[in-house]
UniProtKB/Swiss-Prot annotation:
Keywords: ATP-binding, Nucleotide-binding, Stress response. InterPro entries: ATPase_NBD (IPR043129), Heat_shock_70_CS (IPR018181), HSP70_C_sf (IPR029048), HSP70_peptide-bd_sf (IPR029047), Hsp_70_fam (IPR013126). One of its GO terms (molecular function) is ATP-dependent protein folding chaperone. The keyword Nucleotide-binding applies. This is Heat shock protein 70 B2.
C-alpha cells in the first residue's frame, strides 16, 4: 500500500516525514535540507519553490512570496494583515474582502490566493517525499496551529486538495509534537506534558496527559496565531532602519531590495545570538553605495523583543487554568519550534516553572512533521507494534452553543471539550402558544451571543399550542473528529425533528473575529487585574502614611526628637499630597513611593518602638513599619 505522509506546513519552513519499517524518516529535499523554506518566487522565466526561491529573494523581493500562512483563511481587513503588509515587499490586494497576492510572472501581472501559494509549498513537500519513496503519494496528514480557526483549517485543507493530496486529517501542531515526544521517549506511567510551540509565525501551548506512551489526551490548548520568529526579525529590522537613518540620513524602508538584504542579515544575527552574546552585521553597498557594518548584543535584542517574549507566558497560564492544573503538576515541558532556541524565551519559561528544567530532547524543527507522519500511518491502518495502540484525543478550541432569551449564549459544548463529542439539552418556549423556535448556533467565549460568531441557524415549527415553558425541545450538538458540527432539534411531544450540519464554511471566522472573541474577554480580565493591583498598591501606601501619623500621636512618641518627628510628619504629608494628585499612577510608582517612605521613616519608627520598651505596638503600625524595614516595599496585607 502506498505510504501516507505527514507534512508540517510552517509559516517560514516546512517539513515532511513518513513512517515505515517501524520508524519515522524525516525526508531531506533536493538540496539535502530536512526543512524547506515556505517561499515561492516568480520570475520572467520560471517559478521557484523552497530553497531556490529563498536564495534569490534579494534580487527579486517584490515577486517572492512568503508568510502565506499569515494570510490563509483570513479577511483582507484583518488588523493583523494590515500590520504585516508594512513588512512585506510583495503586494497584497483586496479581492472581495479576501487577501490575494499580486506578482509579475513571465511578464504578466497575476494574483494568487494564499491557498494557492501554500499549495505550491505542499506540492514541493509531496515531490520531496515521492523522490525518496520512489512512488507517487496521495494521502497526507497536514498540521495547523492548535489555535487556528475553522476558516484557516478549511483553507489549509483546500491548499492540500489544490496540491493533489487527499488530506486524511488536519491535526494540531502541538498534538503532533506530543505524539513525537511520547513515542520517541518510551514514556512510562501517566505524565502531564506541556508543549510550548513557538515557530516562525505562530505560537501554541497545549497540555496533554500521556499514559504509557500510547494514550494521548489533550487537556487544554491556548496560543496566538500571530506570534513568532518573523515578529522578532521585524523588531530587529526596525532597530537597524532607525540606526541607518541616524548615521547616514537615508531611509532604508523605501528600498525593497535593501530592506530584504537587511532582513536576511537580521535573521542570521538572531540565530547567532542564540549561541553568542553578540552578532555582527556586514552588508556591502546596502544603499547608495554605503557599506553598512554594525553590531547587536543579545541584551539589546532581548530588550527590542521583551514584550513579545513576555507575552508567551499568558497562554501558558491560560492553558494551565483551563486544564485545572497548577505548575507543579506538569512533569515535562517540551520545546518545539525554532524560536524556542532563544535563550531569553527558555529562561522566562523556566523561571515561570520555578526553575524546572526544560526538555530539549526532541528536534524542535522536525517534531511536528514526525507526529504528523505517525498519525498518517495510524489513519492508513498501519499495524506496526509501535503505533497500533496509540490513541489520540484532541479538543475543541472554542465553545459552541445556542442563543436563548435575552440574547444569552447558552453553551452546549465548552471550549477544550474532547472531540468527538455529543451534548444534549432540553429547552422550551418563551411565550404562550409559541408555534415555532429559531435555533441559532454560535461559537465563542463571551456571555452574550452578539459578541460571538454566528455559525448557522434553522427554524423548528409546528409546536402544538401550549403555555410558555411547557413544550420540550431537545437540542443536540454533535462535533466529530474533523471539527464538523451537526446540530439537531426535536420537539418531544410530536417527535418533529430538524437538523443542520455546520461544516467549516469558508466565511466562518476571520482572524479578527477569533482574536476579538478570545482576546477581548482576556483583555478585559487583564485590565481589571491591573486596576486591582494599582488600587491595592495605592491603599497600602495610604494606610502606611496614616499609620505613621497615628504613631506620632501614640504613647512613647514624646520620646522622639523634634527633628525625627518633623521628618516623619513632612514625609507623610508630602506622600499624601502626591497620592491625591496622582490617583491614576502605575502600581510601580506607588511601590516606589512606598520604598522611599519606608527608607526615610523605618529607622525612626524602629527607634520609637525600642523606646516603648518592647511593649505592645500601637495600632497595627509596628507590624507594618517594622515589617517593611530594609525590604523593597510591602509584602504583607494590612491587618485590622
Amino acid at each position: 500500500m502506498p505510504s501516507a505522509i505527514g507534512i508540517d506546513l510552517g509559516t517560514t519552513y516546512s517539513c515532511v516525514g513518513v513512517f515505515q519499517h517501524g520508524k519515522v524518516e524525516i525526508i531531506a529535499n533536493d538540496q539535502g535540507n530536512r526543512t524547506t523554506p515556505s517561499y515561492v518566487a516568480f520570475s520572467d522565466t520560471e517559478r521557484l519553490i523552497g530553497d531556490a526561491a529563498k536564495n534569490q529573494v534579494a534580487m527579486n523581493p517584490t515577486n517572492t512570496v512568503f508568510d502565506a500562512k499569515r494570510l490563509i483563511g483570513r479577511k483582507f481587513d484583518d488588523p493583523k494583515i494590515q500590520a504585516d503588509m508594512k513588512h512585506w515587499p510583495f503586494t497584497v490586494v483586496n479581492d472581495g474582502g479576501k487577501p490575494k497576492i499580486r506578482v509579475e510572472f513571465k511578464g504578466e501581472r497575476k494574483t494568487f490566493a494564499p491557498e494557492e501559494i501554500s499549495s505550491m509549498v505542499l506540492t514541493k513537500m509531496k515531490e520531496t517525499a515521492e523522490a525518496y519513496l520512489g512512488q507517487s503519494v496521495k494521502n497526507a496528514v497536514i498540521t495547523v496551529p492548535a489555535y487556528f480557526n475553522d476558516s484557516q483549517r478549511q483553507a489549509t485543507k483546500d491548499a492540500g486538495a489544490i496540491a493533489g493530496l487527499n488530506v486524511m486529517r488536519i491535526i494540531n501542531e502541538p498534538t503532533a509534537a506530543a505524539l513525537a515526544y511520547g513515542l520517541d521517549k518510551n514514556l512510562k506511567g501517566e505524565r502531564n506534558v506541556l508543549i510550548f510551540d513557538l515557530g516562525g509565525g505562530t505560537f501554541d501551548v497545549s497540555i496533554l496527559t500521556i499514559d504509557e506512551g500510547s494514550l494521548f489526551e489533550v487537556r487544554s490548548t491556548a496560543g496566538d496565531t500571530h506570534l513568532g520568529g518573523e515578529d522578532f526579525d521585524n523588531r530587529m529590522v526596525g532597530h537597524f532602519v532607525e540606526e541607518f537613518k541616524r548615521k547616514h540620513k537615508k531611509d532604508l524602508s523605501k528600498n525593497a531590495r535593501a530592506l530584504r538584504r537587511l532582513r536576511t542579515a537580521c535573521e542570521r544575527a538572531k540565530r547567532t545570538l542564540s549561541s553568542s552574546t553578540e552578532a555582527t552585521i556586514e552588508i556591502d553597498a546596502l544603499m547608495d553605495g554605503i557599506d553598512y557594518y554594525t553590531k547587536i548584543s543579545r541584551a539589546r535584542f532581548e530588550e527590542l523583543c521583551s514584550d513579545l517574549f513576555r507575552s508567551t507566558l499568558q497562554p501558558v497560564e491560560k492553558a494551565l487554568s483551563d486544564a485545572k492544573m497548577d505548575k507543579s503538576s506538569i512533569h515535562d515541558i517540551v520545546l518545539v519550534g525554532g524560536s524556542t532556541r532563544i535563550p531569553k524565551v527558555q529562561s522566562l519559561l523556566q523561571n515561570f516553572f520555578a526553575g524546572k528544567s526544560l526538555n530539549l530532547s526532541i528536534n524542535p524543527d522536525e517534531a511536528v512533521a514526525y507526529g504528523a507522519a505517525v498519525q498518517a500511518a495510524i489513519l492508513s491502518g498501519d499495524k506496526d507494534d509501535k503505533i497500533q495502540d496509540v490513541l489520540l484525543v484532541d479538543v475543541a478550541p472554542l465553545s459552541l452553543g445556542i442563543e436563548t432569551a435575552g440574547g444569552v449564549m447558552t453553551k452546549l459544548i465548552e471550549r477544550n471539550s474532547r472531540i468527538p463529542c455529543k451534548q444534549t439539552q432540553i429547552f422550551s418556549t418563551y411565550a404562550d402558544n409559541q408555534p415555532g423556535v429559531s435555533i441559532q448556533v454560535f461559537e465563542g467565549e463571551r456571555a452574550m451571543t452578539k459578541d460571538n460568531n454566528l455559525l448557522g441557524q434553522f427554524d423548528l415549527s409546528g409546536i402544538p399550542p401550549a403555555p410558555r415553558g411547557v413544550p420540550q425541545i431537545e437540542v443536540t450538538f454533535d462535533l466529530d473528529a474533523n471539527g464538523i458540527l451537526n446540530v439537531a432539534a426535536k420537539e418531544k411531544s410530536t417527535g418533529k425533528e430538524k437538523n443542520i450540519t455546520i461544516k467549516n464554511d469558508k466565511g466562518r471566522l476571520s482572524q479578527a473575529d477569533i482574536d476579538r472573541m478570545v482576546s477581548e474577554a482576556e483583555k478585559f480580565r487583564e485590565e481589571d487585574e491591573k486596576q486591582r493591583e494599582r488600587i491595592s498598591a495605592r491603599n497600602q501606601l495610604e494606610a502606611y502614611c496614616f499609620n505613621l501619623k497615628q504613631s506620632l500621636d501614640g504613647e512613647g512618641a514624646s520620646k522622639l526628637s523634634d527633628a525625627d518627628r518633623k521628618t516623619v510628619q513632612d514625609r507623610c504629608e508630602e506622600t499624601l499630597r502626591w497620592i491625591d494628585g496622582n490617583t491614576m499612577a502605575d502600581k510601580e510608582e506607588f511601590e516606589h513611593k512606598m520604598q522611599e517612605l519606608t527608607k526615610a521613616c523605618s529607622p525612626i519608627m524602629t527607634k520609637l518602638h525600642q523606646q516603648a520598651a518592647g511593649g505592645p505596638s500601637p495600632s497595627s503600625c509596628a507590624q507594618q513599619a517594622g515589617g517593611f524595614g530594609g525590604r523593597t516595599g510591602p509584602t504583607v496585607e494590612e491587618v485590622d
